[in-house]
Regions:
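Structural motif
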Residues: 3, 9-17, 242-253
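Short helix/loop capping segments that flank catalytic or ligand/cofactor-binding pockets
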Residues: 6, 32, 79-82, 86-88, ...
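Conserved acidic
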Residues: 7-8, 12, 22-25, 82, ...
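Active-site-proximal segment of RNA-dependent polymerases
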Residues: 8, 17-78, 139, 152
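Short, hydrophobic/amphipathic alpha-helical patches that form generic packing surfaces
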Residues: 14-29, 145-153, 253-264
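A generic structural motif
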Residues: 41-49, 99-111, 197-207
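Conserved polymerase palm-domain catalytic core
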Residues: 65-167, 172-181, 210
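Active-site and adjacent loop segments of nucleotide-processing enzymes
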Residues: 126, 130-133, 178-199, 204-360
């Protein structure tokens, strides 16, 4: 690829992260609240659970008479952060901490990055001007700040009423259907002038169940909408790297418990995670730091969908609209998982041993 955008994935020292985090972590969610005001409602979805995210999307969707959802993704956002973009972002932090020389010094280190790496034949040294160093304490905050403010400027440029659902470089823009053609025509060229490559990530959503945000879609339940993953993504939940069988059982119990909290009353998912719980063990893995910090554990906090009873007809229809699996096929899949018995030919797990010397 000729002259590709550089991607810097080396982390800085823990001391640097700690020193910068003392400033950015205390203002992060206050900045998110401030960004909400640019679009007239909750905009940055960081810190919300799936029920809350869905509630905010429904509220934004219902604020239009004939809405459409435009899925947008800034390709290689970190790599395309120019030094001008970083300086603008850093000035927002300096404004909140006037006179803090340490903060200014720390932020200055991000404008021109020097790094090195060892390889069998020697050592590589490099320098970048601009470019986000993936892993910096302000990566998520900075990306949200840049994206939301640019989207606000873009909507003002197009003179359109809009709501934004954002999580860094991943976002969905809601507008009236009659403004769709104008917005899609102007989007890519406008962002190119800003130094970013904005792409349409998937199909335009003409109904709420077709909105795709962070690989999730809204599904209606008797207690309101919740965000649900595509069934294909459950493959990631079905692979454990635990080195012994006891660890596998504990892992299954922990993932099953979190899964039921997230999707216990959702078609198919409830049956799958219930099978995990039946064959897993409670164990102490749920209290282990390595588990508490996983995506499943974080997403399930504050969720209690396993207490909402059996799958409702309205949920089956909404799930069908979102993912194309008919209610009949939903029941067939659920029955299959409900019949699984550990130790039989239909056991829910298989052990695979890696060749000697191979690690993951």
């Amino acid at each position: 690829k000729p002259d590709p955008a550089p991607r810097v994935i080396q982390t800085r020292s823990p001391v640097y992260h700690y020193r910068l985090g003392r400033y950015t972590r205390v203002i992060e969610h206050e900045i998110y609240k401030g960004l909400d005001g640019l679009f007239g409602g909750p905009t940055v979805m960081k810190g919300y659970n799936p029920d809350q995210v869905a509630t905010h999307i429904v509220e934004a969707w219902n604020s239009f008479s004939d809405p459409v959802g435009i899925p947008l993704d800034a390709s290689r956002f970190d790599q395309h952060c120019s030094i001008d973009a970083l300086k603008w972002e850093h000035n927002q932090y300096r404004f909140l901490f006037p006179g803090e020389r340490e903060l200014s010094w720390l932020l200055k280190r991000q404008e021109r990055n020097k790094g090195y790496g060892d390889y069998p034949g020697g050592q590589i040294k490099y320098q970048t001007v601009g470019c986000r160093m993936s892993g910096d304490m302000n990566t998520g905050l900075g990306n949200c700040l840049l994206m939301v403010c640019m989207m606000r400027a873009f909507c003002d440029h197009c003179k359109v009423k809009a709501r934004l659902i954002n999580n860094g470089d991943d976002c969905v823009l809601l507008v009236e259907r009659d403004r769709l053609a104008h917005v899609t025509h102007e989007c890519a060229p406008w962002f190119i002038r800003m130094g970013f490559n904005m792409k349409f990530e998937g199909d335009i959503a003409y109904r709420i169940e077709h909105i795709t945000f962070c690989q999730l879609r809204p599904v209606r339940t008797p207690t309101g909408y919740t965000m649900v993953r595509d069934l294909k993504s459950i493959v990631k939940d079905a692979a454990s790297l635990q080195p012994n069988i006891d660890g596998v059982y504990a892992w299954m119990g922990a993932v099953g418990e979190c899964g039921l909290a997230l999707a216990g009353d959702i078609p198919v998912y409830g049956a799958i995670y219930a099978a995990y719980c039946r064959h897993g063990s409670a164990g102490r893995v749920r209290n282990h730091n390595n588990f508490r910090n996983t995506g499943m554990a974080i997403a399930s906090r504050g969720m209690n969908r396993f207490a909402n009873g059996p799958v409702a007809d309205i949920t089956r229809v909404s799930y069908y609209l979102a993912f194309g699996i008919s209610p009949t096929h939903q029941v067939i899949i659920e029955n299959r998982f409900n019949e699984l018995v550990a130790g039989s030919d239909a056991s829910p797990f298989t052990l695979h041993h890696l060749p000697k010397g191979i690690t993951i």
